[in-house]
UniProtKB/Swiss-Prot annotation:
Entry's Gene Ontology molecular function annotations: manganese ion binding; metalloaminopeptidase activity
Cofactor note: Binds 2 manganese ions per subunit.
Upper lineage: Bacteria, Pseudomonadati, Pseudomonadota, Gammaproteobacteria, Enterobacterales
Organism: Wigglesworthia glossinidia brevipalpis
Gene assigned in the entry: pepA
The name this protein goes by in its record: Probable cytosol aminopeptidase
Catalytic activity: Release of an N-terminal amino acid, Xaa-|-Yaa-, in which Xaa is preferably Leu, but may be other amino acids including Pro although not Arg or Lys, and Yaa may be Pro. Amino acid amides and methyl esters are also readily hydrolyzed, but rates on arylamides are exceedingly low; Release of an N-terminal amino acid, preferentially leucine, but not glutamic or aspartic acids
Function field: Presumably involved in the processing and regular turnover of intracellular proteins. Catalyzes the removal of unsubstituted N-terminal amino acids from various peptides.
Binding-site residues, Mn(2+) 2: K270, D275, D293, E354
Length: 501
């Protein structure tokens, strides 16, 4: 799907579908002033026979009358409220796309930008529209032998901008939303793949696809089991001991040559392509969803795609920490003590608290890059789901400024996050009788204590931890990866790159 700005003269072309919203009573007159008299007549004639007061989101198609100034029209019923929220706007977009699938026109002009929702400016109206459109069109049927596929005839949606002074802002919105949406699709596709296809080797080596596409901006290094061992990342290796699949660490550098010697922003993604829990095995119920335990790494890859396409003026390193946590005679065990890359020792109380063991070594490893900021993204704790549900990503940080920047990006993108406390009182729960620290505490505040564990290895950085256990995928009938928090993180980097809107 292509998105562009409509030339004012193009709306008279009869082969172009007009998409516009109609309010109850006289409110629709404002929308109609931008279209031809013939189209106004056609709409008014149809609206007289429609009860639209409480029928928000319903669509009506008006075919072309072949008269001069006549277009095919898709009417979207907006009800009686002039101000709508983003939830209703999303419903309007979804219903619009559903209707477009059955209409055989290749181009359309989109007039819904005149709506007032959440006091959004033009940039956010366009960005929300495109992101909702991509979400509506997304399907993952890669492994079905037979699918009910559909053909969408629409190839281009043009946004009608009546103020020429806003065209530059509109084009920026298109660029941002398309790039972010493509990054989200990459993240979703990887998350939705089964672990017998998307194993540590497959996931880590997806970074080469990015390198091939953006060879001037991207460099990639992939460490295998031997390199990881030689560096001394013992905690990382212990997690993978029970799997026949070797671990890999993929390091993706964006704009390294341009910012030679400068400090990068570092994103670390947990990439457990399957997590059985190890010896502390998980319950069988919903264990299939543990293929989603790599969504942190998938999100980092999606963000790196998005910023490469946007050509942000930043130095960013994305790291995919890929391995499996399986049950075997060689698996690491409760009671084991592991010396991490930092030199600290960890007593393993529960092998299902494996993500923090992988991440602690990677957080230590990135010290060599002298990072400006370090953010880790992980499906880390079920406790975060209990605390924040499936709406908010958990945020823990040692830096108020970084937290505020993340929360600002989360609020404006509606990819929501909520800050949890970082406090020594929680850290005391991680004390070990036999090692420097335990890998898990008691159940109280365990989403926070998981963050406190990671902080033990991140004290030298401006650091933030995003726990996406509740937001990375949906369960039940609509089970699939969500692509979060690609939108949040890309917006954060857009803001850091001085392209803030």
């Amino acid at each position: 799907m292509k998105f562009s700005i409509a030339d004012k003269s193009i709306k008279q072309t009869k082969d172009i579908l007009l998409i516009l919203g109609i309010f109850y009573k006289d409110c629709y007159q404002k929308t109609l002033k931008y279209i031809s008299d013939e189209n106004k007549k056609n709409i008014i004639q149809v609206v007289k026979n429609i009860k639209i007061k409480d029928n928000i989101g319903s669509t009506y198609f008006i075919s072309n009358t072949n008269k001069v100034g006549s277009n095919p029209i898709l009417l979207i019923m907006l009800g009686s409220k002039v101000n709508i929220n983003s939830r209703i706007y999303k419903k309007l977009i979804i219903n619009t796309i559903s209707s477009i699938k059955n209409i055989k026109y290749k181009k359309s002009i989109f007039f819904l930008l005149n709506l007032n929702f959440n006091n959004s400016n033009l940039y956010w109206k366009i960005r929300r529209s495109i992101e909702y459109i991509y979400e509506s069109l997304y399907e993952f049927n890669n492994f079905k032998s037979k699918t009910k596929s559909y053909k969408i005839y629409m190839k281009e949606i043009m946004f009608y901008i009546h103020d020429e002074n806003e065209i530059k802002q509109a084009n920026i919105a298109i660029s941002h939303s398309v790039s972010i949406s493509k990054g989200i699709i990459i993240t979703k596709n990887l998350g939705n793949m089964p672990s017998n296809f998307c194993d540590p080797h497959y996931l880590s080596h997806q970074s080469y696809i990015l390198k091939d596409k953006y060879s001037e901006k991207i460099s990639v290094e992939i460490m295998d089991h031997k390199k990881i061992k030689n560096i001394g990342m013992n905690a990382y290796l212990h997690v993978s001991k029970g799997s026949s699949k070797n671990p890999y660490l993929s390091i993706i550098k964006y704009n390294e040559n341009k910012f030679n010697g400068k400090s990068p922003i570092i994103l670390i993604g947990k990439g457990l392509t399957f997590d059985s829990g190890g010896i502390s095995i998980k319950p069988s119920n919903n264990m299939d969803e543990m293929k989603f335990d790599m969504c942190g790494a998938a999100a980092v890859l999606g963000v790196m795609h998005a910023i490469s396409e946007l050509n942000l003026n930043l130095y960013v390193i994305g790291i995919l920490a890929c391995c499996e946590n399986m049950v075997d005679s060689s698996s690491y065990k409760p009671g084991d003590i592991i010396k991490t890359l930092s030199g600290k020792t960890v007593e393993v109380i529960n092998t299902d608290a494996e993500g923090r063991l992988v991440l602690c070594d990677v957080i230590t490893y990135v010290k060599r890059f002298n990072p400006r900021i370090v953010i880790d993204i992980a499906t880390l704790t079920g406790a975060c789901v209990i605390a924040l549900g499936h709406h908010y990503t958990g945020l823990i940080s040692n830096c108020d400024e970084l937290s505020e920047n993340i929360l600002n990006a989360s609020n404006i993108t509606e990819d929501l996050a909520w800050r949890l406390p970082l406090n020594k009182k929680f850290s005391k729960q991680l004390k070990s009788r036999f090692a420097d620290i335990s890998n898990i505490s008691d159940r109280s505040g365990s989403a926070i204590t998981a963050g406190c564990f990671l902080y033990e290895f991140a004290k030298e950085y401006k650091w933030a931890h995003l726990d996406i256990a509740g937001t990375a995928w949906k369960s039940g009938v609509y089970k699939q990866a969500t692509g979060r928090p690609v939108s949040l993180l890309t917006q954060l980097l857009i803001n850091y790159g001085d392209k803030k809107i």
